[in-house]
Amino acid sequence: MSKTHLTEQKFSDFALHPQVVEALEKKGFYNCTPIQALALPLTLAGRDVAGQAQTGTGKTMAFLTSTFHYLLSHPAIDDRKVNQPRALIMAPTRELAVQIHADAEPLAQVTGLKLGLAYGGDGYDKQLKVLESGVDILIGTTGRLIDYAKQNHINLGAIQVVVLDEADRMYDLGFIKDIRWLFRRMPPAAQRLNMLFSATLSYRVRELAFEQMNNAEYVEVEPEQKTGHRIKEELFYPSNEEKMRLLQTLIEEEWPDRAIIFANTKHRCEDIWGHLAADGHRVGLLTGDVAQKKRLRILDEFTRGDLDILVATDVAARGLHIPAVTHVFNYDLPDDCEDYVHRIGRTGRAGASGHSISLACEEYALNLPAIESYIGHSIPVSKYNPEALMTDLPKPLRLTRSRPGNGPRRAGAPRNRRRSG
């Protein structure tokens, strides 16, 4: 982890429970990020927090640290039953829930607090078995949480801490009714520590905070610019016919260590995957159609470096923290300006630098003015020589539902650069 994004504030400076500090230091966490330095004094004083920070700024560890400290410092309610968790962390996607659970495990190992995971797609009985033995902190998506609650596998009457992560995305995905259903089954807001984190604190997110929290304090960490000053942005104007060849040429030129390619539809993602897999790249596909176990396996392979390129839709990739992403390619300019910020926020994280390359084709170039207005600057334009684009491309593979991760290639060096001046 780069230290350039850290503050002088140390976790040990706070009156944190000693086991929490021990767990953090075992993971090499000594200094706070800005959002952690702002949020922790409030949560340690028992104040509710609604936090906004750019992606990759340590929001997850801010609310996990607060949650573990609170549970260790406050007794559970009298006569708490085995099906009553003490803390509930809600996430918009199953991948994000799994990721939060993984980030919480080192804290759980030191403190002895038990974790549970609840998400749709698969693993129903496996997740239920863990819940039946009793958990302190339950992390999950709203649909599976409601399912378990309706069947009385969980009871929310003993909740002491609530976290809502990626609250803006909860709205985008239509989960607000589910969230309100869950809140109605908990003790009143004044009897809980409530935390909400979001990439944007829009009016609707603030309305939710007012409705479900107890006089929340708003904390914001604004970047120098919405897209992050460590991210180099670049824009090309390809024709529809040259777009795929330009992408593959750029990949050969840049030879990224770890890249994510975004497209606006799952069908476009599948097409990109097919071209890159046929050309021998180690590439994975992350869309809503990919089975849950494969999604988790592909994410793990990409995180470990067994895959070099991940092709993804916005919904599938939102909220995921994958370290050391060097490049983001916007094969399609997104229809939503905020999605542009979220996409390129996959790179340039935690003090590192990154490179974002966008292709403004005939189909999606109309999205560019709104994006540039939203981020507050023009994206630098680069030109390319159409005659220098790759032509020796194999026929794309057709996706088989058994393997959306492919390719042995990662030997040798990149080919000569093909851009015009």
UniProtKB/Swiss-Prot annotation:
Which family, according to the similarity comment?
Belongs to the DEAD box helicase family. RhlB subfamily.
The residues that the entry says bind ATP are: 53-60
As its record notes, the protein acts as a catalyst of: ATP + H2O = ADP + phosphate + H(+)
Q: Which gene encodes it?
A: rhlB
* Residue ranges annotated for the Helicase C-terminal domain, each copy included: 245-390
Checking Gene3D superfamilies in the record gives: P-loop containing nucleotide triphosphate hydrolases
* Protein name in UniProt: ATP-dependent RNA helicase RhlB
Q: Which PANTHER family match?
A: ATP-DEPENDENT RNA HELICASE RHLB, ATP-DEPENDENT RNA HELICASE RHLE-RELATED
Any idea of its EC number? 3.6.4.13
One GO MF annotation is: ATP hydrolysis activity
Locate the compositionally biased regions of type Low complexity.
Answer: 402-414
Residue ranges of region Disordered?
396-421
Quote the InterPro entries the UniProt record gives. Answer: DEAD/DEAH_box_helicase_dom, DEAD_box_RNA_helicase, Helicase_ATP-bd, Helicase_C-like, P-loop_NTPase, RNA-helicase_DEAD-box_CS, RNA_helicase_ATP-dep_RhlB, RNA_helicase_DEAD_Q_motif
- All copies of the Helicase ATP-binding domain together span 40-219
Question: What's the source species for this entry?
Answer: Salmonella arizonae (strain ATCC BAA-731 / CDC346-86 / RSK2980)
